């Protein structure tokens, strides 16, 4: 399977938190994705980039917090995350190299 350069625009980065690490026991991996990425695009990108079989994709959007910076009111960017469920026997180790 060859990776299309557009797949790199869909997957921004892996999410490495305690909660995301606990999901690996359930064969799930969490990624930050582009805000306009759809579930089929995310599934295709993960399958092509990591050479695994994806059985499901759940997405969530975390709204950015309102903050004050130098007396000005601003807002952090919204973040879209995808929880990708892998087929039995497939794994993605995103914690190597830390």
Swiss-Prot record:
One record GO biological process: translation
Keywords: Ribonucleoprotein, Ribosomal protein, RNA-binding, rRNA-binding
Keyword Electron transport (UniProt): no
Gene Ontology cellular-component terms listed: ribonucleoprotein complex; ribosome
Record-linked InterPro entries: Nucleotide-bd_a/b_plait_sf (IPR012677), Ribosomal_uL23-like (IPR013025), Ribosomal_uL23/eL15/eS24_sf (IPR012678), Ribosomal_uL23_CS (IPR001014)
UniProt keyword RNA-binding, yes or no: yes
Recorded GO MF terms: rRNA binding; structural constituent of ribosome
PANTHER family registered for this protein in UniProt: 60S RIBOSOMAL PROTEIN L23A
Task performed by this protein: One of the early assembly proteins it binds 23S rRNA. One of the proteins that surrounds the polypeptide exit tunnel on the outside of the ribosome. Forms the main docking site for trigger factor binding to the ribosome.
NCBIfam families: PRK05738.1-3 (NF004359), PRK05738.1-5 (NF004360), PRK05738.2-4 (NF004363), PRK05738.3-2 (NF004366)
Quaternary structure, from the entry: Part of the 50S ribosomal subunit. Contacts protein L29, and trigger factor when it is bound to the ribosome.
Family indicated by similarity: Belongs to the universal ribosomal protein uL23 family.
Name of the protein in question: Large ribosomal subunit protein uL23
Gene: rplW
């Amino acid at each position: 399977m060859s990776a299309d350069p557009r797949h790199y625009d869909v997957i921004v980065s892996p999410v490495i938190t305690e909660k995301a690490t606990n999901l690996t026991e359930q064969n799930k991996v969490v990624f930050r994705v582009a805000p306009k990425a759809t579930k089929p695009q995310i599934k295709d990108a993960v399958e092509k980039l990591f050479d695994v079989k994806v059985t499901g994709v759940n997405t969530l959007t975390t709204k950015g917090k309102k903050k004050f910076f130098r007396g000005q009111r601003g807002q952090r960017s919204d973040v879209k995350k995808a929880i990708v469920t892998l087929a039995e026997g497939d794994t993605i180790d995103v914690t190597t190299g830390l």
